[in-house]
Amino acid sequence: MPSDDRLIYLLTRAQHSLMTHLKHELNAKGNTITPAQAGILFLLRKQGHTMTKLSRILAIDNSATTGLVDRLEKSGLAHRTANPEDRRTYLIRITEKGKAAIDEAYVTIKQVNEEIKSGFSESEIETFKKILNSVQEKFERGTRNRIPVS
């Protein structure tokens, strides 16, 4: 099999290895949130969002988002409030406990980001980010959902 036929496999394995490592590092530091929960809490840090918007930004289905938010709510890290703009929906908001958890997790996440970059030049990192953004753009249905890798 030519090496370029393994790109999907390599991307999938890299993502799986990275998430496994991040989860291990978070747990080792005593943080009880998962990488997926951290993603939601990062988004909620600045403002509340609806389930639909969280799903769209994180590129996961609504049922997965609901499960994540349910667990965050059960842990006291987030809560639902009525959406003043649309009474049929709720805004998910971070709690003070959630802010403390994500602030603590951020230290570990930053450390893992540094681990990813170690051994690569700034130029290589920039090229890598451009490639990842290009792959994302190529396969998304619309650019309104795009979250650039910065």
PLM feature spans:
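N-terminal helix-turn-helix DNA-binding core of bacterial DNA-binding proteins
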Residues: 20-64
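C-terminal regulatory/oligomerization modules of transcriptional regulators
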Residues: 1, 123-150
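N-terminal leader segment of winged-helix/HTH proteins
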Residues: 1-29
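Charged, amphipathic alpha-helical coiled-coil/dimerization segments
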Residues: 19, 70-130
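Short, locally clustered residues in the helix-turn-helix/winged-helix DNA-binding domain
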Residues: 15, 42-46, 106
